[in-house]
């Protein structure tokens, strides 16, 4: 892609972790995963390619601020999207194995 077409945009690749559901790595498409620190890759596990896309500041992402994603990729070579926090209503529901136990009842 020519530089004129991508002015102010960023062509990226997105990878998901097989180890941690909901964890994704965004990287510059041309550089791939080579700028991601080894220690992070060790914790991320096998990186499965999901898609390639052009990040554009005027086009929002579902779970991350697109401008922050672009800035992190340009500064450090990657952006790590963490899994969303557990749904508090689901977490507190009766029968959830991790629901805190009340001892005053």
Swiss-Prot record:
Source organism, top-level taxon: Bacteria
Region (Disordered): 79-105
YcgL domain residues: 10-94
UniProt feature, compositional bias: Basic and acidic residues: 95-105
InterPro entries in the record: YcgL-like_sf, YcgL_dom
Name by which UniProt lists this protein: YcgL domain-containing protein ABO_1767
Source species: Alcanivorax borkumensis (strain ATCC 700651 / DSM 11573 / NCIMB 13689 / SK2)
